[in-house]
Swiss-Prot record:
<keyword id="KW-0812">Transmembrane</keyword>
<feature type="transmembrane region" description="Helical; Name=6">
    <location>
        <begin position="299"/>
        <end position="319"/>
    </location>
</feature>
<keyword id="KW-0999">Mitochondrion inner membrane</keyword>
<keyword id="KW-0813">Transport</keyword>
<protein>
    <recommendedName>
        <fullName>Mitochondrial glutathione transporter SLC25A40</fullName>
    </recommendedName>
</protein>
<dbReference type="InterPro" id="IPR002067">
    <property type="entry name" value="Mit_carrier"/>
</dbReference>
<feature type="transmembrane region" description="Helical; Name=3">
    <location>
        <begin position="143"/>
        <end position="163"/>
    </location>
</feature>
<dbReference type="InterPro" id="IPR023395">
    <property type="entry name" value="Mt_carrier_dom_sf"/>
</dbReference>
<feature type="repeat" description="Solcar 2">
    <location>
        <begin position="140"/>
        <end position="224"/>
    </location>
</feature>
<keyword id="KW-0496">Mitochondrion</keyword>
<dbReference type="InterPro" id="IPR018108">
    <property type="entry name" value="Mitochondrial_sb/sol_carrier"/>
</dbReference>
<keyword id="KW-0472">Membrane</keyword>
<keyword id="KW-0677">Repeat</keyword>
<dbReference type="GO" id="GO:0170036">
    <property type="term" value="P:import into the mitochondrion"/>
</dbReference>
<feature type="transmembrane region" description="Helical; Name=5">
    <location>
        <begin position="236"/>
        <end position="256"/>
    </location>
</feature>
<comment type="similarity">
    <text>Belongs to the mitochondrial carrier (TC 2.A.29) family.</text>
</comment>
<dbReference type="GO" id="GO:0034634">
    <property type="term" value="F:glutathione transmembrane transporter activity"/>
</dbReference>
């Protein structure tokens, strides 16, 4: 039982503001290292099937998915830059040579405006809630990470969902603050408050189970590795390994919901932009049935390898950086306490 209460005791020495700083650094580093993979993937997709005006595609900065709108069929947007790539590595080399290394982070800054705050809220909320749950039910401490992970993701997804839809609509036509308010008021008058959370359902169906599985397995793997290497605090390598393993497991289990969520996210985004359309977006379960009808049950697990390549390193980098930051602040706080004695 003592082992299960150790995380709660450790977290006491870390203030929420310090958790926020640690998660902010982790979020920025994760975006910096993972975004080039998605930029290259999008460029390869655009080469094989050029984007047309008004169509959406999903852009991932390692923290969360964002809808991007192809606003000009003849424009020179980063995802339309010319190039003849023979593969992933060739794309990396050619982009750096012809466009400069900065091009590997094309489109990143606007997405960080929401991704970083969402990640900070998510990680801080998780740690704080997990401590509370362990204190209140120490006999069931093993499920604290599962409940805290699911709840934290539900909260952050609910807060960010309206902002993401507004950002998507603004991509297609730049709006002043006054025009934006009129647009929001019109949407509320027509469809009610729930219209701001279009696409929330598929996001929650994927992200909440993912988060619950991820944190539950992460804490188990971390504890197991700490015991194996006889250490009370996880090293960077332990956190990195535990993050990659738990992220991979969660990614595989929730892949069907990711396939559905991606398709519906694009569909909802296009409907939000083309306000004149009377078409209604399909429900999550109808989309899932359609995918099975078109491609069989295996269609729900399409893109497994690309998802693992994206999720595993992102989870590993984020959690290991976050744990390193918490360890730094824990030592700093302990030193301050010793000096005050």
């Amino acid at each position: 039982m003592q082992k299960n209460t150790e995380p709660a005791q450790e977290a006491v020495h870390i203030t929420p503001s310090q958790q926020m700083i640690a998660s902010s650094v982790g979020a920025l580093l994760t975006s910096f290292l993972v975004t080039p993979l998605d930029v290259v993937k999008i460029r390869l997709q655009a080469q094989s099937k050029p984007f047309i005006k008004g169509k959406c595609f999903v852009y991932c900065n390692g923290l969360m998915d964002h809808l991007c709108m192809c606003t000009n069929g003849n424009g020179k947007a980063w995802y339309k830059a010319p190039g003849h790539f023979r593969g992933t590595m060739d794309a990396f080399v050619q982009i750096i040579r012809s466009e400069g290394i900065k091009s590997l982070w094309s489109g990143l800054p606007p997405t960080l405006v929401m991704a970083v705050p969402a990640t900070v809220i998510y990680f801080t909320f998780y740690d704080q809630l997990r401590v509370i749950l362990i204190r209140r039910m120490p006999e069931r401490a093993e499920i604290a990470s599962l409940v805290a992970g699911a709840t934290a993701r539900l909260g952050s997804a609910t807060l960010i969902s309206p902002l993401e839809l507004i950002r998507t609509k603004m991509q297609y036509r730049p709006l002043s603050y006054k025009e934006l308010m009129i647009c929001i008021q019109s949407s509320l008058a027509k469809d009610g408050w729930l219209s701001l959370w279009k696409g929330w359902g598929p996001t929650v169906l994927r992200d909440v189970p993912f988060s619950a599985l991820y944190w539950h397995n992460y804490e188990l793997v971390k504890q197991s590795l700490c015991q194996r290497y006889n250490t009370l605090q996880p090293t960077f390598a332990i956190s990195f390994t535990a993050g990659a393993v738990s992220g991979s497991i969660a990614a595989i289990v929730t892949l069907p919901f990711d396939v559905v969520k991606t398709r519906r996210q694009v569909e909802v985004g296009e409907l939000e932009v083309f306000t004149y359309s009377h078409k209604r977006s399909s429900s999550t379960w109808k989309l899932m049935s359609a995918i099975v009808a078109e491609n069989g049950f295996g269609g729900l697990f399409a893109g497994l390898v690309p998802r693992l390549i994206k999720v595993a390193p992102a989870c590993a980098i984020m959690i290991s950086t976050y744990e390193f930051g918490k360890s730094f602040f824990r030592k700093l706080n302990n030193e301050r306490q010793l000096k005050s004695l």
